[in-house]
């Protein structure tokens, strides 16, 4: 189905991995702890944005006075993710595409999560060993919707951007793929993969 492309690039959360519930619960716990309001449509719109940038935007949006640094809040959320991941994370149906192209096409993961979190999540879902590169938000200057994440994936795989196809669930990620000059697959529209992140 994707034979025309030289490389396949995947977002992780909501695309390769069903983790929407995990991230919603850990965001709710984090925002509650630090007194930041929960705005469901706003959180949904920030899907795919790294935790640091999400927190900065929320504090700015609500004009919050928070007695903690952004780093402290990110550390709290990441710890909750590690503690609760085993309860809420599993691979999506895209694992079939990954298996079908393993050894035939180079593949990479480009995510708004930290690289360490991504590697841990992929391992937990039995997806480690399939990807030539895993690019987390900590590896790029500008996260999605900037193209940096997917451009670095392509560079690490040794493939030109125009020869890549990106699988994404979030508008920010689809924008990033377009800005990188790559074909993009909206996994909800094409593969019926739903992200249950802040639906209500």
Residue ranges of predicted features:
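Asp-based, Mg2+/Mn2+-dependent phosphohydrolase catalytic module
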Residues: 1-7, 99, 114-200
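Active-site neighborhood of HAD-like aspartate-dependent phosphohydrolases
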Residues: 1-43, 179, 193-194
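Short, acidic loop-to-helix structural element flanking the phosphoryl-transfer center
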Residues: 4, 82-109, 113-115, 119, ...
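An amphipathic alpha-helix signature
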Residues: 24, 28, 51-56, 74, ...
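Alpha-helical substrate-recognition element adjacent to the catalytic core
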Residues: 30-62
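Helix N-cap/coil-helix junction residues
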Residues: 36-38, 64, 127, 158-159
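Metal-dependent phosphoesterase signature
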Residues: 59-99
